[in-house]
């Protein structure tokens, strides 16, 4: 089954409607690649421990735990970007609720960790919300 793009007249002048999915994919891939640079040692420790139960989750966060969640977050962003692209091709615009969730996640994260990438979530969420409008 082939997905046809929506009628061009309904999305005239809305170039951003085609950018949300690819930008999410780009941020997700960047996240995964950055995980390899920032967490090379902890990821190596996870691999050398045999993977099974290699990440301790106790009262204190470990480097292995941070590496795991940082990498998983990147993969989830890639998945979200793929879903956004497919939905944009099929429906022509995005539903607003995931955009609001991205803004909320970014805001909460930026409050807790102001020097972080959580600001990117707010930007992507705002773009998503813009792309949800008719």
Regions found by a protein language model. Give the residues of each.
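Juxtamembrane membrane-water interface segments that cap and precede transmembrane helices
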Residues: 50-65
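N-terminal signal-anchor transmembrane alpha helix
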Residues: 18-40
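Residues within membrane-spanning alpha-helices of integral membrane proteins
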Residues: 21-28, 74, 99, 106
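A cytosolic-side transmembrane-helix exit/cap motif
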Residues: 39-46, 64-65
């Amino acid at each position: 089954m082939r997905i046809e793009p929506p009628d061009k007249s309904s999305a005239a002048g809305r170039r951003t409607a085609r950018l949300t999915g690819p930008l999410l994919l780009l941020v997700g891939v960047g996240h995964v690649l950055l995980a390899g640079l920032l967490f090379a040692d902890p990821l190596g420790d996870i691999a050398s421990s045999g993977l099974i139960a290699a990440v301790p989750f106790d009262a204190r966060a470990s480097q292995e735990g941070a590496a795991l969640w940082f990498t998983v977050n990147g993969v989830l962003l890639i998945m979200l970007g793929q879903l956004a692209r497919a939905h944009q091709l099929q429906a022509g615009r995005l539903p607003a609720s995931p955009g609001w969730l991205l803004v909320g996640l970014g805001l909460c994260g930026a409050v807790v960790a102001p020097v972080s990438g959580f600001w990117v979530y707010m930007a992507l969420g705002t773009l998503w919300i813009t792309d949800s409008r008719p």
